[in-house]
Design a protein with these regions (language model features):
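N-terminal cap/lid segment of alpha/beta-hydrolase-fold proteins
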Residues: 1-12
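Conserved HGGG/HGGXW glycine-rich cap/lid loop of the alpha/beta-hydrolase fold
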Residues: 13-62
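Active-site loop/oxyanion-hole signature of alpha/beta-hydrolase fold enzymes
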Residues: 44, 54-93
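Short beta-strand immediately N-terminal to the catalytic nucleophile in serine-hydrolase-like folds
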Residues: 94-96, 120
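Gly/Ala-rich beta-loop-alpha elbow adjacent to hydrolase catalytic centers
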Residues: 96-100, 104
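Flexible "cap/lid" loop of the alpha/beta hydrolase fold
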Residues: 117-150
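Conserved serine/cysteine hydrolase catalytic core
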Residues: 176-241
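Catalytic histidine-centered segment of alpha/beta-hydrolase-like enzymes
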Residues: 242-251
């Protein structure tokens, strides 16, 4: 495995790369989790002819701090394309969590080498700007109460991750996430953690791809995805799991889907 920091439009990005005939590109959602460790339950199950490329966004994981105040989503997409180009990745599928589902669709729109998308509990327009932003799912509100009852995010993630991670792997994941988030306590006022994501970024998406799109979702979100901007003839919704981090609990299924693509 190669680890490298690559200079891009939005700042320096920390990446982990294992070359192979085919590449699984992993993108984490919002938060401070380092991408390699976040997707380790999937990465450990990849067959030998599949390599991987994991990318930490600015201010996340092991990527350096960089104010994102002046950057928009297209800038982040361009930066991901720069990383793919540097490693000459030409046969790949993207496995993306949460808001990175939108990022991965934009990446696939921009060039021709993507062979499939696995979108895990991806963020829709409705959740960020629409009906579900105004009236969240009861399940989501119940989750917030559960996290508080357990004593915070660490205890909750530890509980749901214990079946997917060894104790040692989870400690590494959380230690790196804490180091990443602790850095943000000392940034100056006005520092923006993420690039700006506008309503227009969800509109006029071109998802008429010739490759499969798999959406992994908890059952209660099925209709949201059927009605979303990500629905198409090539989109298949796969229900399962009982929490947002389905790449932990459904890692075997994700590997099966990758193998279907290649």
């Amino acid at each position: 495995m190669k680890e490298k920091i690559i200079k891009t439009k939005v700042g320096q990005l920390f990446v982990s790369y294992q070359p192979a005939e085919k590449i699984a590109v992993f993108l984490s959602g919002a938060g401070s989790l380092p991408t390699y460790e976040n997707f380790l339950p999937v990465i450990r199950k990849l067959p030998k002819n599949w390599g991987y490329l994991t990318i930490d966004y600015p201010n996340t994981g092991q990527s350096p701090l960089e104010n994102q105040e002046n950057f928009v989503l297209d800038d982040l997409v361009q930066s991901i394309l720069e990383v793919l180009s540097q490693f000459k990745v030409i046969q790949y599928a993207v496995c993306a969590h949460s808001i990175s589902g939108l990022v991965s669709v934009k990446v696939a729109e921009s060039e021709q080498f993507c062979q499939g998308l696995i979108l895990i509990e991806l963020t829709t327009y409705s959740v960020l700007y629409g009906e579900l932003a105004q009236n969240p799912y009861p399940e989501f509100l119940a989750l917030q109460e559960k996290v508080q009852t357990l004593g915070g995010g660490y205890e909750y993630l530890k509980k749901i991750g214990q079946e997917s991670f060894s104790v040692a792997d989870f400690k590494i994941l959380w230690a790196k996430a804490e180091r990443s988030s602790d850095r943000l306590k000392s940034v100056q006022e006005g520092f923006q953690h993420y690039c700006s994501i506008a309503k227009s970024d969800f509109q006029n998406l071109d998802i008429s791809f010739q490759f499969p799109i798999f959406i992994l979702s908890q059952a209660y979100r099925e209709q949201e995805y059927k009605d979303s901007e990500f629905a198409s003839q090539n989109t298949q919704i796969i229900l399962g799991g009982s929490h947002h981090y389905l790449h932990w609990s459904q890692s075997e299924k994700i590997v099966e889907l990758l193998l279907e693509m290649g």
